[in-house]
Amino acid sequence: MASSAQSGGSSGGPAVPTVQRGIVKMVLSGCAIIVRGQPRGGPPPERQINLSNIRAGNLARRAAATQPDAKDTPDEPWAFPAREFLRKKLIGKEVCFTIENKTPQGREYGMIYLGKDTNGENIAESLVAEGLATRREGMRANNPEQNRLSECEEQAKAAKKGMWSEGNGSHTIRDLKYTIENPRHFVDSHHQKPVNAIIEHVRDGSVVRALLLPDYYLVTVMLSGIKCPTFRREADGSETPEPFAAEAKFFTESRLLQRDVQIILESCHNQNILGTILHPNGNITELLLKEGFARCVDWSIAVYTRGAEKLRAAERFAKERRLRIWRDYVAPTANLDQKDKQFVAKVMQVLNADAIVVKLNSGDYKTIHLSSIRPPRLEGENTQDKNKKLRPLYDIPYMFEAREFLRKKLIGKKVNVTVDYIRPASPATETVPAFSERTCATVTIGGINIAEALVSKGLATVIRYRQDDDQRSSHYDELLAAEARAIKNGKGLHSKKEVPIHRVADISGDTQKAKQFLPFLQRAGRSEAVVEYVFSGSRLKLYLPKETCLITFLLAGIECPRGARNLPGLVQEGEPFSEEATLFTKELVLQREVEVEVESMDKAGNFIGWLHIDGANLSVLLVEHALSKVHFTAERSSYYKSLLSAEEAAKQKKEKVWAHYEEQPVEEVMPVLEEKERSASYKPVFVTEITDDLHFYVQDVETGTQLEKLMENMRNDIASHPPVEGSYAPRRGEFCIAKFVDGEWYRARVEKVESPAKIHVFYIDYGNREVLPSTRLGTLPPAFSTRVLPAQATEYAFAFIQVPQDDDARTDAVDSVVRDIQNTQCLLNVEHLSAGCPHVTLQFADSKGDVGLGLVKEGLVMVEVRKEKQFQKVITEYLNAQESAKSARLNLWRYGDFRADDADEFGYSR
């Protein structure tokens, strides 16, 4: 600490006190401060200076934890204003001081002046003049300092300043609150708005004690997202600093101690508050990282409201320069070329919930594991039935939901893959199986990180790493933030609700069960299915959602090359092109949603029939690509002509199974393909029902009279032969008659049987649904079945629009459509087909106005941008309408364009 000696007169005269200088580090009270020197290679020395000749009130003191009978001591009147007067005047400022007295206990008393010499402001006199301190009695009257203090005190009394004002000063006593009953509620109540505060103590570089204003809460605040070296407490009570702990503490002290700051309270951890301290001169969290005094910590970085990437960037800055705690840091070496690190690939298969199989541009297949996430796991495995074979996809809670989320988002689509790290192969241990080498990557589609989307829905968790482990996702902080949101919102794995149970019956190879299912599948016509596995080109395993069962399915009408088989004692080689046929089927249908028509079954309990994908018959496609031949059993099928035509075309190409086919060449006339144009052929329909997801059901106006006649005849028949109440036993998928609320009977289909009192039915001619007791149902007379007149309600969806994900916004759109078109005649044109239902444009019958375009104009829906050339004109019109709605801030757009930041994929909702 700097000092300068001032000489007096002769050696016999009184000694002149030595003037010393320092920087005020802390104000202990209205009459005591701590000064420090300039730092040189480490934290500087400090000393406490007590002001001579004056007395200020004592500040509040908390009772010692070791003395259970002791009580907290409150502020004395005017003690805190005196402390604040000095704090605002002196903290961080240079002062000079003289020591007049030193007690045997080492306490030093003296005079303090603001500035570099004693000509500056006398701090003791300023305190007394403001009425914040009193002159000590008993001093020599002829002492010049004492005389000046006496004058200052008289002036303060005359002006009624401070303690000399009217009243007892009780309003200056703080109501200090040392504890908070519910820290989590306290943090949430501030809604991450900055709170004014004073930093009262610095425990280490990243932990402080702060006084929150204006309510005087004294709280411990840990800086979100970082951790500085700490002071280890030894058994004898002493503290041992970790490397750079003292330097980090001084770095924070010199910038924040007893400064006015604002704190954003961000979260709560073990009764400690996590927050970010804001100061006009900068963000201490980022500064500590940048100077190499702190490291990022994963467990709290997700709550940092100013963006975790800023903290990672600051840490990288210090690592690259090997500053302080990073002096021995060695950067990981890159072992991948750029082309292998980033690439675009097509997703061919989803493996459970954390890995996918992609097809590279080279045609090779590669398994990619999603970085830093863990799929749902089975808890309490010891309680499981050891005799029961575990089926992870269905038996592990939320595994099926996670797989389905990935399947629906990714299968058949191109994704961007960024390899984050390669996990080396590991041998098996007693508790952990062996793992082969794994390529772990961040996979995005449409700018959305699939792992983050999965975590945000509570369908996966984030792996926790050692702090020095850099082998992690390049978007690790976003994953942590997504998990925090999922936990807060109780999504998926973090939900308090009962876990979903999937009772899926596997009837593959079970002849008895297959016989029971066969009639239902035959009557159902086309059934929805998901291809779970491809055994060969014509043999597949299907999951039927409505029936919740797994079946083995054989393609009808074709003879596909048989693949290699393992037989007892030998391996039977596969027929030529069997592998190509299997690969073709895999690439086309594996994990896709398809439609199947079951015709029969074989002796082994395998179902035989036709499989359709995107309107195409897989049997025909295999024949068309010369990977199968037509089987004679196809003669009885309605697809026989298509199969023969495809086979003839394949024969002419002489490829694959027809490579050695010999026939007289036939002149082939190739049709001239014309560029497809948008077809606008509007037909009159009657809108009968609008669903909550903005689909709608219509009746064809041209067949309306047939329905009216059928309904009239059916009701007359029922009136003549009424069903016996309670005699009908409903089964899912069956057609029946149901009595609607108007007391009339209508044709319906049973969708679900909860109990005899709760039967879910769908009115096939009108599109509405209802839950009825079985007493209001009856058998559908054969004379009025769907073979006589097919179901008249057809489901459609609006083309070129996206339905809002937000429940309230979607309700607004549905309400608008209900008001405009329900129970009215409109004009309908099919624009394109989809796996769910055809997408159409709908016009008002009188004005010919486009209903979907009207929704866009009102800002109730968004535009679905399609790439097909024939739709560009109408898409442009829709986009122009959307821009107009945006400009007018209508409905969805009332807060501007929300789509970039408010993606539902990440768990947000408006």
UniProtKB/Swiss-Prot annotation:
Crosslink position(s): Glycyl lysine isopeptide (Lys-Gly) (interchain with G-Cter in SUMO2): 513
Residues modified to Phosphoserine: 426, 645, 785, 909
Limits of the TNase-like domain: 18-166, 193-328, 341-496, 525-660
Placement of sequence motif Nuclear localization signal: 321-325, 388-392
Protein name: Staphylococcal nuclease domain-containing protein 1
A Pfam entry, by short name: SNase
Subunit structure, as described in the record: Forms a ternary complex with STAT6 and POLR2A. Associates with the RNA-induced silencing complex (RISC). Interacts with the RISC components AGO2, FMR1 and TNRC6A. Interacts with GTF2E1 and GTF2E2. Interacts with PIM1. Interacts with STAT5. Interacts with SYT11 (via C2 2 domain); the interaction with SYT11 is direct.
The organism of origin for this protein: Pongo abelii (Sumatran orangutan)
Record gene name: SND1
GO molecular function: endonuclease activity, active with either ribo- or deoxyribonucleic acids and producing 3'-phosphomonoesters; RNA binding
